[in-house]
Amino acid sequence: DVPETVLDKYPFQLSGGMAQRVTIALAACSRARLLIADEPTNGLDEAGRAQFFALLDSIFPDAAKLIITHDISVAARCDRVLVLCGGRMLETGTVDAVLGTPHHPYTKALLAAQVANGMQPSPVLREGVSGCPFYARCSESDEACLNGAMQKHTDGKIEWWCCHA
């Protein structure tokens, strides 16, 4: 598609790649210093993801970028990572530290999950209850995890919130 033909289309009529390009063009008009992108590479193949990040870096070389993703390969392209479960922070640090030596059982489970082995269903997250949102599926959970407050831990490179260390 050339730009003139894109103007006459509704968003649902654009391919995933073209929709991403239009979104980037709109953001480029704002000269943003902070970009927040929710699943920006969803539906793109590896080549499309690489093109997306190259384009993002060329248009916004000095902007801070917050990428929200479930794709570990996308998270691996970032400088830092924050792992959330049920809206709660479980682990944060540099990508190399968190992906290389995860501390929280949830992060370990995410990294161990392989699409080739089949994805497990998402856990039912308990709302309005204290304790770890990963309790029901955690191999290391105990009674303290069910109702206790998650404590912040650090090893100097990674921070994680867990009921046990």
Segments and roles (model prediction):
Residues 1-7:
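ABC-family P-loop ATPase nucleotide-binding domains
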Residues 4, 94-165:
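Charged, flexible cofactor/metal-binding loops and thiol motifs
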Residues 19-22, 49:
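ABC ATPase nucleotide-binding domain signature region
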Residues 43-118:
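P-loop NTP-binding/switch modules centered on Walker-like glycine-rich loops
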Residues 10-14, 18:
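Conserved ABC ATPase signature
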